[in-house]
Design a protein with these regions (language model features):
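Gly/Ala-rich beta-loop-alpha elbow adjacent to hydrolase catalytic centers
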Residues: 1-6, 10
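Conserved S-adenosyl-L-methionine
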Residues: 18-20
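Extracytoplasmic/secreted proteins, especially bacterial periplasmic and envelope-associated proteins
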Residues: 8-9, 70, 107, 111
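Short, electropositive, low-hydrophobicity segments enriched in small/polar residues
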Residues: 6, 56, 98
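The feature captures the conserved acid-bearing segment of alpha/beta-hydrolase catalytic domains
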Residues: 23-87
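Active-site signature of alpha/beta-hydrolase-fold catalytic machinery across serine-
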Residues: 12-16
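Catalytic active-site module of serine/aspartate enzymes centered on a nucleophile-bearing elbow/loop
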Residues: 92-94, 98-124
């Protein structure tokens, strides 16, 4: 799980080796891999890219959201199990970039726990 500027690191790590990586949860990542990059490392990997509100109000973040959408599409085309979740698009509004500190942070945590439980296999 990563947030903001550390958002790219799980993707870079998975591209080097999938050992020990059961899934990736990136919360408002500062970057996603370029959609033209090699997507084979992500084949079969559960990936959630989560975004809150207000992205369009910040010129530096709107292109990052757009790039992450393109990455999710490219990763899925290569066999990943990637999902883009933009909270306002599912009716959850009012979240800042620091979702873990917002008033509904426990609801967001429950959402993440539920997604992980449904999509990420546990180690035996």
């Amino acid at each position: 799980m990563s947030h903001s500027q550390s958002g790219i690191y799980p993707f870079q790590t998975a591209a080097l080796s999938r050992k020990g990586i059961a899934g990736i949860v990136a919360i408002e990542p500062g970057a996603c891999p370029e959609p033209t990059a090699d997507m084979t490392p992500y084949a079969g990997l559960p990936i959630l890219v989560l975004w809150g509100d207000y992205v369009d109000e910040f010129p530096r973040w709107a292109p990052r959201l757009k790039n992450c959408r393109a990455f999710v599409a490219a990763a899925n085309a290569a066999g990943a199990k990637a999902e883009m979740l933009v909270l306002p698009e599912i009716g959850i509004k009012g979240n800042s970039h620091m979702l873990m500190q917002d008033d509904n942070s426990l609801d967001i945590a429950d959402l993440l726990i539920d997604w992980i439980g449904k999509h990420v296999a546990t180690a035996e």
